[in-house]
């Protein structure tokens, strides 16, 4: 969700923050994870500030805290419309400072496992076309979700979720998809929720402000049910407006809207997925039950599902959850690596050979027959928007499952046979991953015969007593 970082910096303790998170999550949040994450939020924020995050401040010099949808108190700190970018830059600086090697243009093809224990991975160097293996004591899957299935873009293709799925790891809570309420109608431009904590108001069709009591997903669903809404930013002060200069520029250049004079039409779209690779409080991947972990495998970020968010996301918890899960998984992986030995050389060798064969087979089958990966993605987005949108039903989900299966069986044209910098091949691999995770999410939505959080079934309009 596009917003700052929630913490109880302005409260006596984190109890209400935790309660708000549980309430938004509709009884599907994991209590220990919620307590540890909300309880450590202030320290995470302080650490980022120490590393150089230039937080917006109030008149007393304290971090400015905005009250966003689903928050019982002002709780969200940030840097206006650039919080995510600033946090990413600061974390990259810390990687450089610590001489942590990073490699780009690497596509992970497979995780190598034996007896529920990670041995390494096989990857493709996109720049050179080389397929290589890395033996590892611990592996952290820190990745995005799979919301590209709805949006038709390549920002979140579910690659890590697909890697886990191929190894027989059951994914969790895939039926829950968060929609961003402040999306400009007929565009993909998502405005930060922080605007609502700085004087912005969502106006319904009746001309009255819409409720922000029940969280951003509830607000998004209300907007969709009403056929749209408008965002009024005319009451944002001049001092606050300086923190949203990018918003003003994007609205003017992309939509021709001056928010100081005109209201902004809204229509929510899928913004992030909540489910993914199930993890415990320490980021260890679990499979088949919360007491059964996969040795050496960890997950963090949007690819992970620690059940922090439950059935719906609350304001300010998205970035907080990513930071907290990254720290937990990284620390646990380091501990694992320090006490383990390398193993699985023969399994890695076999996996490497199989990857070479698959790669050569895909490149040798280039030709004009079939459709492009982009066409597949566009068709998938149409299917997901139609049948896996705000309201779902058994008949619609059955149609979605059949459509995705047909897309998986469709021949895809690959015109470039060169192994070097073959971005067309990479897009095909990612599209295959996205299809597999999208199929699993439709199955999960079909299996949950109730309405809970942001999963709404028109044929099961109420929720079960037991989640």
Give each language-model segment a name.
Residues 1, 6, 47, 53-67, ...:
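Glycine- and aromatic-enriched mobile tails/lids
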Residues 110-128, 132-133, 261-308:
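FAD-site-proximal beta/loop scaffold in flavoenzymes
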Residues 1-22, 26, 152, 181-182, ...:
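Conserved N-terminal glycine-rich FAD pyrophosphate-binding loop of Rossmann-like flavoproteins
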Residues 163, 169-270, 332, 336-338:
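An anion/pyrophosphate-binding glycine-rich loop and adjacent beta-alpha core
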Residues 138-189, 307, 315-332:
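Glycine-rich loop(s) and the adjacent beta-strand/alpha-helix scaffold that form part
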Residues 24-64:
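Rossmann-like flavin
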Residues 5-12, 32, 79-82, 127, ...:
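Alpha-helix capping and helix-loop boundary segments enriched in small/acidic/polar residues
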Residues 50-130, 135-138, 142, 180-187, ...:
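Conserved redox-cofactor binding core of oxidoreductases
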């Amino acid at each position: 969700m596009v917003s700052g970082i929630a913490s109880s910096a302005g409260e006596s303790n984190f109890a209400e923050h935790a309660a708000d998170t549980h309430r938004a999550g509709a009884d599907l949040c994991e209590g220990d994870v919620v307590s540890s994450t909300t309880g450590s939020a202030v320290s995470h924020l302080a650490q980022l500030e120490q590393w150089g995050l230039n937080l917006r401040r109030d008149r007393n010099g304290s971090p400015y805290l905005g009250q966003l949808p689903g928050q019982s108190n002002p709780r969200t700190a940030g840097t206006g419309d650039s919080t995510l970018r600033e946090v990413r830059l600061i974390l990259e600086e810390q990687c450089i400072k610590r001489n942590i090697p990073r490699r780009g243009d690497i596509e992970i093809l497979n995780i190598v496992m034996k007896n529920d224990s990670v041995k390494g991975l096989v990857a493709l160097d996109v720049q050179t076309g080389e397929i290589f293996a890395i033996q590892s004591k611990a592996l952290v899957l820190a990745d995005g979700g799979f919301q590209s299935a709805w949006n038709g873009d390549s920002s979140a293709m579910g690659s890590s979720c697909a890697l886990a799925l191929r190894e027989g790891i059951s994914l969790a809570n895939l039926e829950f998809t968060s929609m961003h309420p402040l999306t400009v109608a007929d565009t993909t431009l998502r405005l930060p929720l922080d605007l609502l904590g700085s004087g912005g108001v969502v106006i319904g069709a009746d001309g009255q402000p819409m409720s922000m009591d029940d969280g951003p997903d509830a607000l998004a669903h209300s907007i969709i049910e009403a056929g749209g809404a408008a965002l009024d930013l005319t009451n944002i002060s001049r001092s606050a407006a300086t923190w949203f200069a990018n918003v003003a520029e994007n609205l003017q250049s992309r939509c021709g809207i001056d928010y100081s004079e005109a209201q902004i039409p809204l229509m929510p779209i899928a913004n992030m997925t909540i489910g993914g690779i199930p993890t415990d409080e320490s980021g260890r991947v679990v499979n088949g039950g919360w007491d059964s972990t996969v040795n050496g495998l960890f997950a963090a970020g949007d690819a992970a599902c620690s059940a922090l968010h439950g059935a719906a996301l609350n304001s300010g918890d998205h970035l907080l959850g990513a930071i907290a899960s990254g720290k937990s998984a990284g620390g646990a992986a380091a501990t694992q690596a320090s006490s383990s030995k390398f193993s699985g050389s023969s399994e890695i060798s076999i996996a490497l050979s199989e990857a070479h064969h698959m790669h050569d087979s895909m490149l040798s089958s280039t030709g004009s027959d079939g459709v492009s990966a982009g066409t597949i993605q566009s068709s998938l987005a149409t299917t997901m928007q139609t049948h896996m949108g705000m309201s779902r039903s058994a008949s619609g989900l059955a149609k979605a499952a059949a459509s995705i299966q047909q897309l998986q069986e469709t021949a895809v044209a690959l015109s470039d046979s060169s192994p070097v910098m073959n971005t067309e091949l990479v897009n095909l691999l990612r599209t295959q991953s996205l299809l597999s995770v999208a199929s699993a999410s439709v199955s999960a939505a079909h299996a949950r015969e109730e309405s809970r959080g942001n999963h709404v079934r028109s044929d099961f309009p109420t929720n079960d007593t037991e989640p």
